Structures are given as C-alpha cells and as structure tokens.
Amino acid sequence: MLLAACTVEPLATSSSDSTLSTGLAGQATSEVLSGISVAPVKTRVAQQVRNRLLFAMNGGELKPGGQYEVVLSVSERSQTLAVEGDSLTATAARVIVLVSYDLVDVNTKKVVAAGRRQSVASFDRTPQSFANQRAEREAQDRAAREVAQQLRLAVAQDIASL
C-alpha cells in the first residue's frame, strides 16, 4: 500500500495515457524529445556532442514545429595523468568535456531549463605523435558520446518537470 502514490514512469514511454505536465498533456517524453532542435555549434568536439544528442533524441529525424531548442556551450581540455620517471614524458592523459546547456522555448525565446554535464575519458600516450593524436581524438569522441547521453536524460527530465 505504500506504493499507491508512486508516479514513476519510464522517460521513453510512448503510451498515450502518459502525461508529463499540464502543459504537455497527452504527449510522451519521447514524442516531445523528437521535436527538439539543437542549435549549431562551432568546434569538432561540440559537433560530436550535438550529433550524438540529436540522434539520441530523435534518431536523426527532426520533427518540424518543435517547441524547444537546446543551446550548447561545449568546452574540452586535456590533462596529463602520469609521467615516466626520468624523462618526465606523459604516459597517460584524460580528456574532459564540459557542456552547459539551455533549453529554450522557441515561441517565447525564454530559457525554461539549464544545466551542466561533463564526461571524462582517459587515453595512453606513446612516443608516436600520430598515435597520440588519434588516441586523444578517440577519447574526445568517447567523452562526447557519454555527455550526449547525459544531456538526453537531463533534457528529458527538464521536459517532464515543465
């Protein structure tokens, strides 16, 4: 009997009896997410985050007439984690991708929700510069993929609370 007041629902439900709030009554979260656009970005890592987020929200097919837009601000940096004793050569590093987002109502241009998410991916360094560049780029891509999933969940929670 303690669970009688429980209102937990899956975020990706497509059931027609699922409502998110009075403003979005009758629309499942997945339907609302599929109509959200993501503003263009400028850097390679930001583009990776944007592409992954778009695909996670709508499978790459944006429904026209969406009510919301996600505006991303993406920063990325690398940090050395370990160095070789005598030569002080970096042997391990990590990439940190930090994303701030605003969920904007397209009609009123007002920010209805905002947040920050980050992801970290580690990689090994070698004496070969090309291998280091590839390892860092792959770490950036892994971090971008992870933070995009975090953003999808955050935006879904924001939509559900409207």
Model-derived regions: residue spans:
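C-terminal/domain-edge helix-coil "capping" segments
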Residues: R134-L162
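Bacterial signal peptide processing site
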Residues: T7-P10
